[in-house]
């Protein structure tokens, strides 16, 4: 029996072998189904913010690259090899709106656990995202992972 039916694991380009080992070990023990959310950093470009945000776009220069796809595929393959149902998602988000993007995805997927395992922004960014999750969905469990870099 697993503690969590669905988990959302957030990672970014700073993930390393220790990150993958922690995710594999924790999820194989505790999760039936895992959604890996790779966060591709987005940077705001002057002059584009007003126009693009007005039409509902991100407003930055983020682009999903083959490296992003390879990274999320590596996590998905790792978890699938452990016998879990594993899925991958890539989102682009600037640091200031990362929390909203994560919470929106977690709610859309109906997860009961969100694991914050991204490194960009450090502990302060993870604390902010945790507050956003608790404020919008107090029944969702949140696991804040220690830095691996």
Regions found by a protein language model. Give the residues of each.
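Structural beta-alpha unit
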Residues: 1-2, 80-114
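Small/aliphatic-rich secondary-structure junction motif
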Residues: 2-57, 84
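Conserved beta-strand segments of the P-loop GTPase G domain that flank and frequently precede/overlap
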Residues: 9-12, 36-39, 89-91, 114-117, ...
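Glycine-rich, Arg-bearing micro-motifs that act as flexible, cationic patches
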Residues: 113-138, 149
């Amino acid at each position: 029996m697993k503690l969590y039916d669905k988990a959302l694991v957030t990672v970014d380009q700073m993930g390393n072998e220790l990150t993958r080992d922690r995710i594999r070990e924790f999820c194989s023990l505790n999760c039936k189904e895992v959604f890996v959310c790779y966060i591709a950093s987005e940077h705001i470009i002057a002059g584009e913010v007003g126009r693009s945000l007005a039409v509902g776009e991100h407003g930055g220069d983020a682009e999903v690259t083959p490296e992003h796809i390879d990274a999320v595929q590596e996590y998905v393959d790792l978890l699938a090899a452990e016998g879990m149902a594993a899925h991958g998602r890539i989102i682009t988000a600037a640091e200031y709106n990362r929390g909203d993007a994560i919470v929106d995805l977690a709610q859309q997927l109906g997860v009961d656990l969100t694991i914050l395992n991204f490194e960009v922004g450090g502990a302060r960014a993870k604390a902010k995202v945790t507050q956003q999750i608790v404020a919008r969905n107090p029944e969702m469990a949140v696991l804040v992972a220690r830095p691996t870099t």
